[in-house]
Curated annotation (Swiss-Prot):
Record's keyword terms, sorted: Cell cycle, Cell division, Coiled coil, Cytoplasm, Cytoskeleton, Microtubule, Mitosis, Repeat, WD repeat
Species, as recorded: Xenopus laevis
Gene name linked to the record: eml4
Biological processes, Gene Ontology terms: attachment of spindle microtubules to kinetochore; cell division; microtubule cytoskeleton organization; mitotic metaphase chromosome alignment
Name the UniProt record assigns to this protein: Echinoderm microtubule-associated protein-like 4
Region (Microtubule-binding): 1-189
PANTHER family cross-referenced by the UniProt entry: ECHINODERM MICROTUBULE-ASSOCIATED PROTEIN-LIKE 4, WD-40 REPEAT PROTEIN
WD repeat locations: 199-237, 241-288, 296-336, 343-378, 385-424, 442-480, 485-521, 524-563, 567-604, 610-646, 653-692, 702-760, 767-806
Major place of residence: cytoplasm
């Protein structure tokens, strides 16, 4: 006996030693990888310091050679030389990649020399600014960081000329000269404050169906609940109203409805703030009536994101099961009301697509995914796995979805179009003959249901079953004995089926891969309730005098939307992806630029093709009509601005000229009121001015243009707007900017999922702004409607269109309009005034808790974990205090959570591109 114990101890000791050695080897490998990364960062830093030193030497040499009180034209020429080359000398063309410009739509461009990645590059060799930031946080490089800090601070300073004629800001160490207008007598007296106007999310166009599943449900309130970007939308299709839950900080990926049909759980992916720090994935449980957050679950527990989740049914929804997107796809069970994790276990390294509690057996949880279905026995804090036995049946590539029959059997749909019925049986144990092992699930029956995959199963209230097919696009209704009764095919233009849910009466809802939500019956067919773009979205234009907006995207669709009834007026598919657009001043036609250099003119009412032209073979980045509509400027990635004469109300075009002089691709441009001049920006941070009647000549003395009152202001670089740039920006953080027609505010779209509202003009660095979260990807464009009543913003990868209402905050305790600060909950009662020139009625509304006020860049720092957890525990009294109500009505509650994070999509949790919708989806399941 002692010998047996000794041998057992030896084996345990040997196993322990082996485990320690494995762990040591893993640690050594990790240390080596970190050392390699530090080496790369040091090399990048050395290159940055070298470039800064060369630039400083060149500038110093020029200043010594030229008297400071020389002629203005000479000083201006030197300033332009510095801007384009970083030092003295003649202007030389440079590649767009020289400034590491993030160009998310360049995948369609054919040019190699200016191609760039779809996401912002984090390569340490290119992103020198990021390399410096990382090294400043590394203790092992403390000596180097002091030098970097000094150099960085020097180039972030704003320099004013001794004569007060111009001001310089620095972007990635490069000077940008902006001349001060004559009406600014003393720049030191210029003040930039928060604007009194604020934004409130009014409508969201679009639905995320392309790469998600089982994410459409009908609530007892009559609302369809679904998500897109970081917004969960509650849409009442009968009343044409929307409410929004805005508690999430990044992409929402999954949703589960509590058995009471009131409470909802939604899970999101991990995020990254603008400083590169991770924001943790989590699940939020919230009330669909009040839109208040009940719990925030899983902070610090989940990795990468939340893949799927489900409420328990046998115990009336006390528990919540969650599977994350880590390599092990961890299954956790929570008492969500107590926010306590009860059990946790690894599931599999393969993809997991669904998790469900058994509706009658409280101790059983079922998960399925790639080539597996697992039945988990849950008792206390333990989970035991039993694998489903396929036996004589062919094992499918994927088990896609789950449902439960009235007798307790488990129904699963697979990628081969088969419905499998799993029954609990008694199986003889091979270890002990005659013994019984209870609770083993085996296939008792299989039914051929669809051609292609069975993508979704929906158990109806009357016991009937709805199934949705992938390849065949069919919705089939099955009776209690699983015999098919009715079927209907979703038209091809809507894509394949992603979700099916029971609707009112005999209606049902269908979510599709082309981002449609359809409402239909087997007798009457389908009606479109929600639709949106299916690929990255950049092009946006608002009608000059109607409540219409036009969008174009990489999906080749051009869509005209009505901003009043929130409907689609028309859509047209182009031959190429669209990137930019502008309405003719008459509103009769719209010009659309594409990725190949071609541009189209469409009739704004009939969508007929009016004209087609080609300028170069690279992406067109901006289309802009002159004020009188007689000229059209086309900005291209080939560094040129093409000018066209326009006649017959925008129906006839002839080449007028070409502006040549930019050293990088055109990003933005604006016209003067007299149609004589153009101001343009480029990827090399240039601000150039052009005299159009004189043959599109470059104006060398840019001070001549300092007093032009530009008709529009969309250029992101200029004296009136340079204060919008955040500290430490690399010049690519702002994708779009627009000034309101009343010239009071500036709206801005940035790379950190935020929409900002600044005061205009914004001529002081680090200007404060109101900032808003709803997008979950870089915000690509913004535009005010014709009467400044609304702001439209578009998301890139999230493919969403957000419509915000402008509201002016008016304090009853003061005579003037005062912009609220982040501590506005302690201020006097505030009312909201909708900014509509023709309807100045004051409407009391609940205060938007999701509104973020950016006082300093420090406020954009991510809060600690406990701060985000506390966010869920804050009562809705904040709204009550400001609105003067004891409890908000359902239609008045915003349900918007305060959030100071500035986040962008993590590299490992990007919105994936689904395969072609006409392709069979069986081998590429969507989690």
């Amino acid at each position: 006996m002692d010998g047996f114990a000794g041998s057992l101890d030896d084996s345990v000791s040997a196993a322990s030693t082996s485990d320690v050695q494995d762990r040591l080897s893993a640690l050594e490998l990790r240390v080596q990888q970190q050392e390699d990364e530090i080496t790369v960062l040091k090399a990048a830093l050395a290159d940055v310091l070298r470039r800064l030193a060369i630039s400083e030497d060149q500038v110093a040499t020029v200043r010594k050679a030229v008297p400071s009180k020389g002629p203005a034209t000479l000083r201006e020429a030197l300033s332009m030389s510095c801007i384009t080359n970083g030092g003295a000398g003649t202007r030389k063309p440079s590649h767009a990649s020289s400034v590491a410009k993030k160009d998310t739509l360049s995948s369609a461009a054919k040019s190699v020399k200016r191609s760039s990645t779809l996401e912002k590059s984090h390569n340490s060799w290119d992103a020198s600014e990021e390399s410096r930031n990382k090294l400043m946080r590394a203790a092992s490089t403390s000596k180097l960081t002091s030098k970097v800090s000094k150099a960085t601070d020097k180039h972030k300073d704003i320099v004013i000329s001794p004569e007060g004629e111009y001001i310089k800001m620095f972007m990635r160490g490069r000077p940008i000269t902006m001349f001060i207008p004559s009406d600014v007598e003393n720049y030191d007296d210029v003040r930039t404050e928060l604007p009194p106007e604020k934004l409130k999310l009014e409508w969201v166009f679009g639905y995320r169906g392309r790469d998600c599943r089982a994410n459409v449900y009908l609530l007892p309130t009559g609302e369809i609940v679904y998500f897109i970007a970081s917004v969960v939308v509650l849409f009442n299709y009968e009343e044409r109203t929307q409410r929004h839950y805005l508690g999430h900080t990044d992409c929402v990926k999954c949703i589960a409805v509590h058995p009471d049909k009131i409470r909802i759980a939604t899970g999101q992916i991990a995020g990254v703030d603008k400083d590169g720090r991770p924001l943790q994935p989590h699940v939020r449980v919230w009330d669909s009536v009040s839109l208040s957050t009940l719990q925030v679950i899983g902070l610090g527990t989940f990795e990468r994101g939340v893949g799927c989740l489900a409420f328990s049914k046998a115990d009336s929804g006390v528990h919540l099961s969650v599977i994350d997107d880590s390599n092990e796809h961890m299954l956790t069970v929570w008492d969500w009301q107590k926010k306590s994790k009860i059990a946790e276990i690894k599931t599999t390294n393969e993809v997991v697509l669904a998790v469900e509690f058994h509706p009658t057996d409280a101790g059983t949880i079922v998960t399925c995914g790639k080539s597996h279905i697992f039945f988990w026995t849950w008792s206390g804090n333990s989970l035991a796995r039993k694998q489903g036995i396929f036996g004589k049946y062919e094992k499918p590539k994927f088990v896609q979805c789950l449902a439960f029959l009235a007798n307790g059997d488990v129904l699963a749909g697979d990628s081969g179009g088969i419905m499998l019925i799993w029954s609990k049986t008694n199986v003889e144990s091979t270890a002990s003959k005659g013994a019984k092992v209870l609770g083993v699930y085996q296939i008792s029956k299989q039914i051929k249901a669809h051609d292609g995959s069975v993508f979704t199963l929906c158990q109806m209230r009357n016991g009937m079953l709805l199934t949705g097919g992938g390849k065949d696009r069919k919705v089939i209704m099955w009776d209690h004995d699983l015999n098919p009764e009715r079927e209907i095919e979703v038209p091809d233009q809507y894509g394949t089926i992603r979700a099916v849910a029971e609707g009112k009466g005999d209606q049902f809802l269908v979510g599709t891969s082309r981002n449609f939500i359809l409402r239909g019956t087997f007798n009457d067919g389908f009606q479109v309730e929600v639709q949106g773009h299916t690929d990255e979205l950049w092009g946006l234009a608002t009608h000059p005098f109607k409540d219409l907006l036009l969008t174009c995207a990489q999906d080749k669709q051009v869509c005209l939307w009505n901003s009043v009834d929130h409907s689609l007026e028309w859509t047209r598919v182009l031959d190429e992806p669209g990137h930019c657009a502008d309405f003719h001043p008459t509103g009769t036609v719209v010009a659309i630029g594409t990725h190949s250099g071609r541009w189209f003119v469409l009739d704004a009412e009939t969508r007929d093709l009016v004209s087609i032209h080609t300028d170069g073979n690279e992406q067109l980045s901006v289309m802009r009509y002159s004020v009188d509509g007689a000229l059209l400027a086309v900005g291209s990635h080939d560094n040129f601005i093409y000018l066209y004469n326009v006649s017959e109300n925008g129906r006839k075009y002839s080449r007028y000229g070409k502006c040549t002089g930019h050293s990088s691709y055109i990003t933005h441009l604006d016209w003067s009121p007299d149609n004589q001049y153009i101001m343009s920006n480029s990827g090399d941070y240039e601000i150039l001015y052009w005299d159009i009647p004189s043959g599109c000549k470059l104006i060398r003395n840019r001070s001549e243009c300092k007093d032009i009152n530009w008709t529009t202001y969309t250029c992101v670089l200029g004296f009136q707007v340079f204060g919008v740039w955040p500290e430490g920006s690399d010049g690519t953080d702002i994708n779009a900017l627009v000034r309101s027609h009343n010239r009071k505010v500036i709206a801005l779209a940035d790379d950190f999922c935020k929409v900002h509202l600044f005061q205009y003009p914004c001529s002081k660095p680090k200007a404060p702004s109101h900032k808003y979260s709803a997008h979950s990807s870089h915000v690509t464009n913004v535009s005010f409607t014709h009467n400044d009543g609304h702001l439209i913003s578009t998301g890139g990868k999230d493919m969403s269109i957000m419509q915000w209402r402008l509201i002016e905050k008016v304090s009853h305790s003061q005579n003037d309009n005062i912009a609220e600060s982040s501590s506005a909950v302690n201020s006097p009662v505030v009312s909201e005034k909708v900014l509509q020139p023709d309807t100045p009625t004051t409407l009391p509304q609940a205060v938007n808790k999701a509104t973020e006020v950016e006082q300093t860049p420090a406020e954009s720092m991510a809060p600690p974990e406990d701060a985000l957890e506390l966010e869920a525990q804050q009562p809705q009294d904040l709204d009550d205090v400001q609105s003067g109500k004891s409890s908000p009505l359902p239609e008045e509650a915003n349900g918007q959570e305060p959030s100071d994070e500035v986040i962008e999509e993590p590299a490992n949790s990007q919105i994936v591109d689904a395969q072609d919708e006409n392709q069979d989806d069986d081998d590429a399941p969507l989690s």
